[in-house]
Amino acid sequence: MDPASPVHAIVAEREEDVISIANYIIHENASALAPACYLQDLFVDPAKRGAGVGQALIDWLVGEMKTQSWSTLYWNTRENNYRARGLYDKYTPHSGFLRYVIKNPAT
């Protein structure tokens, strides 16, 4: 990836195999004076779920939020993604916001 890009990724490896990846975006935030971090995607190999791998990647991002002085770390998940929500609820309750998406049919 381009080092100047706001899009970043971290991975978790076990025995040289990638078992988890988190893609995140650092962006300006109109409601705060400091940048925010959007965790765009967190994927854990299904065979490795429940072993703390996803939690380790989120913990790393929380540490970076503090080190880099980001105003916020946030993400979205499906309402019925109960397994992921079990992990996410350990960090914070959901915000109550609904997400609306308009896609460009030309892309």
Question: Which residues does each predicted region cover?
Answer:
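A short helix-loop-beta-strand connector motif used in the catalytic cores of GNAT acetyltransferases and
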Residues: M1-V11, Y38
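Conserved hydrophobic beta-strand within the GNAT/NAT acetyltransferase core sheet
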Residues: L39, L73-T77
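Conserved beta-hairpin
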Residues: H8-A22, D45
